[in-house]
C-alpha cells in the first residue's frame, strides 16, 4: 500500500556496508545494500538519514549510504557528502505541489561529526532548523515536513527536547508537519496550532521484541 501514497518517507537509521559486507549489528551498524532496492520496490520515495547511527562507519559509510540511495532513485535528507548538498533542500513535487523534507538527529552516540566536515550530519539546533525551513520555502517548497530523530528510547511519551523542538518549529509558521523516530515505540500525535506533530512513529523493520516496540505505525 505504500506505493499508493502520494509520498512515502522512511527513516534509514543504519549505514550501508560495502557490497558483500562485512556486516555489523548493534552498537555500530553496517547493513546490506540489498535493503535499498527493497525500499524502492515497497514504494518509498525518500529516506531520512540523520540519526544517532549516521557515522557508525565514519564518513565513508555515510557517503556510501547516500550513493546507494541515489543509484536506486530514492531521495534523502539529513546527511550530506558536500557542503553544497547540505545547503540544498530536498524538494519533491507531487500532483503539482512541492514538498520539502528536512531531517535532524539529537546526537551521534559519542562520535564526532567527520573531521573538517561539520555539515555532514544535521543535528538538532532550532535556529539552524528554522533557517533551513526558510531556505526550503525560498526554494519553492509549499509544504515543509521535518523529521526529528530524538526522544528517550522505549518511552511512550515525548521528552522535553521533543516538545520544545516541536513547539518552536510549529510556532515559526515555516513548517507544516513534524514527525519523529528513535524511540522505537509509538508516541502521541499532537497538534500545535495548525501543525500536526507525530512524536514517535514506532518501528517498521526491526529486531526489538518488546510489545511496545512491535506496535508499529506507518503514516
Predicted segments, located by residue:
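Acidic, metal/ion-coordinating pockets
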Residues: 1-219
